[in-house]
């Protein structure tokens, strides 16, 4: 799991993280939840593409129907809901990834917060 900034305020940064993970050979699926101190916050869950593809990861998460006793927040319906994004929230025309040399992630992060408020 990779915490990945706000998919609302810094959408391009969020999507760049996913593209970068995928370019490194991972199958990656986005999810999000509300974090009290941050608002809507995004994450990517990933595994080696040789083990699972994105559809298989999503299917496994959607099939979770029971969790360990004693959890105070996480529920199976919350897991399923966290995989759903609003219309066009994951759409972009950009295809670039982040590298040490490109700094695209930092650029998109700053751009998002500058225009997000």
Could you tell me what each predicted segment is?
Residues 1-4:
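Conserved beta-strand signature within the Rossmann-like core of class I S-adenosyl-L-methionine
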Residues 11-31:
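Conserved Class I S-adenosyl-L-methionine
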């Amino acid at each position: 799991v990779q915490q990945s900034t706000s998919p609302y305020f810094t959408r391009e940064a969020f999507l760049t993280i996913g593209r970068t993970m995928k370019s490194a050979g991972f199958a990656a699926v986005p999810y999000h939840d509300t974090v009290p101190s941050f608002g809507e916050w995004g994450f990517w869950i990933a595994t080696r593409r040789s083990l699972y593809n994105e559809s298989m990861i999503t299917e496994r998460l959607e099939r979770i129907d029971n969790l360990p006793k004693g959890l105070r927040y996480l529920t199976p319906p919350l897991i399923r809901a966290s995989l759903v994004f609003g219309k066009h929230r994951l759409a972009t025309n950009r295809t670039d990834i982040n590298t040490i040399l490109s700094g695209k992630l930092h650029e998109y992060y700053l751009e998002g917060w500058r225009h997000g408020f």
